[in-house]
């Protein structure tokens, strides 16, 4: 099992555990520089990111805002901007957390796009949903929500000449816990390679309030299971996932779940197949 852990960690470019606050600050600096270089390479000056109220988008948003602020200071070009986007489906259960995230990030610009009408309009036109059991239909519509959010972010980025930031990190990547061509679609993923507790460490160091740093993670895509915790979907805890990624001991059953899920979701981490 240890060899499998090492192979998967290498494939996901998992970063080693932080040993000190200096390690955390080094990762923050590295990832801000990465964001800045992505903008320079693309010849663009705008970043777009959906803010959900969870620690992942909060952390990515804090990094993005710092990146453009530093670029403005370094270059004197005030055109560098970060647009934080709220993408609620009707009324979001944890909207207060989303608003607290926005207040923490203090993005250059905030936009809100309620995806409810678009999701409902599309669902009503899909004959494939007819006759499905409620749980299956709810799951499919949940993925529609994630993909409509992607469409909205890319529309804003296209209109404003920007790049879309993703929030994927190693603990989600290993479980394939994202919607293919939904929240998995982005131009840059500045949290890539980090375990979940490392994302929290970055958030904490960037000044995020503790209640948001330690908030129970939820994708919150299904109407029939609002606020359903990620860990309940995984069947393992983030602590166990992080331990697996860092080659540390964990329950045999938990390790088996992670490995099986990793292989089952491999298609999500690959480019489309071609002949």
Swiss-Prot record:
The keyword Ligase applies. ATP binds at residues 50-57, 167, 196, 218. One of its GO terms (molecular function) is ATP binding. It comes from the Bacteria. Its EC number is 6.3.1.5. Deamido-NAD(+) binds at residues 147, 180, 187, 267-268. Catalyzes the ATP-dependent amidation of deamido-NAD to form NAD. Uses ammonia as a nitrogen source. Belongs to the NAD synthetase family. This is NH(3)-dependent NAD(+) synthetase. The lineage of its organism: Bacteria, Pseudomonadati, Pseudomonadota, Gammaproteobacteria, Pseudomonadales. The gene is nadE.
């Amino acid at each position: 099992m240890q060899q499998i852990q090492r192979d998967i960690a290498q494939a996901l470019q998992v970063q080693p555990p932080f040993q000190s606050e200096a390690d955390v600050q080094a990762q923050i600096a590295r990832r801000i520089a990465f964001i800045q270089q992505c903008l320079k390479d693309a010849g663009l000056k705008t970043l777009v990111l959906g803010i959900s109220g969870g620690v992942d988008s909060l952390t990515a948003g804090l990094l993005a805002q710092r990146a453009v602020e530093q670029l403005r200071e370094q270059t004197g070009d005030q055109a560098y901007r970060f647009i934080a986007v709220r993408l609620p489906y009707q009324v979001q259960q944890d909207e207060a957390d989303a608003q607290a995230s926005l207040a923490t990030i203090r993005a250059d610009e905030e936009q809100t796009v309620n995806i409810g009408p678009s999701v409902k309009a599309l669902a009503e036109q899909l004959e494939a949903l007819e006759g499905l059991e409620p749980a299956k239909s709810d799951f499919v519509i949940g993925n529609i929500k994630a993909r409509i959010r992607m469409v909205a972010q890319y529309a804003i980025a296209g209109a404003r000449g920007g790049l879309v930031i993703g929030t994927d990190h190693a603990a989600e990547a290993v479980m394939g816990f994202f919607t293919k061509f939904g929240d998995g679609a982005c131009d840059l993923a500045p949290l890539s390679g980090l375990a979940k507790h490392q994302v929290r460490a970055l958030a904490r160091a960037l000044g995020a309030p503790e209640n948001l740093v330690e908030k129970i993670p939820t994708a919150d895509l299904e109407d029939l299971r609002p606020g359903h915790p990620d860990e309940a979907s995984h069947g393992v805890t983030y602590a166990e996932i992080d331990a697996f990624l860092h080659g540390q001991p964990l329950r045999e059953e938990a390790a088996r779940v992670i490995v099986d899920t990793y292989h089952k979701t491999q298609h999500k981490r690959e480019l489309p197949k071609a002949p």
